[in-house]
Amino acid sequence: MRPLRREMQIVFQDPYASLNPRKRVGTIVSDPMRIHNLGSRAEQKRRVGEILETVGLSPEHYNRFPHEFSGGQRQRIGIARSLALRPKLIIADEPVSALDVSIQSQMLNLLDDLQKELQLTYVFIAHDLGVVRHVSDRIAVMYLGKLVELSPAEELYTRPIMPYSEALLSAVPIPDPDLAAKRERIVLEGDVPSPINPPSGCRFHPRCRYATDVCKQLEPPLVDYGNGHLAACHHPLNVDQATLQKVAAATADSSTPAVAPPTQSR
């Protein structure tokens, strides 16, 4: 597993808790190389200096401690550590949620630049769809631990199929007050069910304004509506009649109906 782990690294959500306060920056960033026995100490130090410059810091920061840096700088250190082994995949777990809004855009731009420069693949975990839009090619929406929609990024924002995705997008702020006034704000009612004991059928049905009896009884499968856009919903939104009929025909022999009858589309 060790060779595989070199290719997968993580950037943590909290830039304060994820850095050891007793270690200097140089040690923090070089630890992955030391653990994997990559290079001599001199080579590791040179590599750390290069990485620090790549993420917008200075090699002079090598001997400083985490408490000497701001939150944004600490997150840059965390990103530098994730790059030490030249990974192919980086899992970014809410990497900007703990930062000031003024710093978030800088961090997103850095991640975007690194992705292009180093040919990285990100698994970007976030609850803010406004942030996700800037870094994603494909977006997966999850609810209570289940994948409910998977779509090319821009298509999700223009044509959400799952009602939960629709509600999430309605909460994304729009800077234009005229457009914001015309948009419907969907407020979900009720409490979020327990992930330990989720509802039967579709897990979203207790809070869904389109839910019917079939939603309470049967869990909808993930269905491909074309163009790589998949959703798990008995009453899909923004799907034309022809596509609904095609999907219904393809699943006619299934014991679990994939979608509601085409006449119920909206």
What are the residue ranges of the model-derived segments?
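Short catalytic/signature loops enriched in Gly
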Residues: 1, 152-262
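P-loop NTP-binding/switch modules centered on Walker-like glycine-rich loops
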Residues: 88, 95, 99, 103-181
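Conserved ABC ATPase signature
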Residues: 65-69, 73
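Conserved ABC ATPase "signature" region
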Residues: 43-60, 166-170
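Interfacial catalytic loop of ABC nucleotide-binding domains
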Residues: 14, 46, 63-65, 183
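Q-loop/switch helix immediately C-terminal to the Walker
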Residues: 14, 23-34
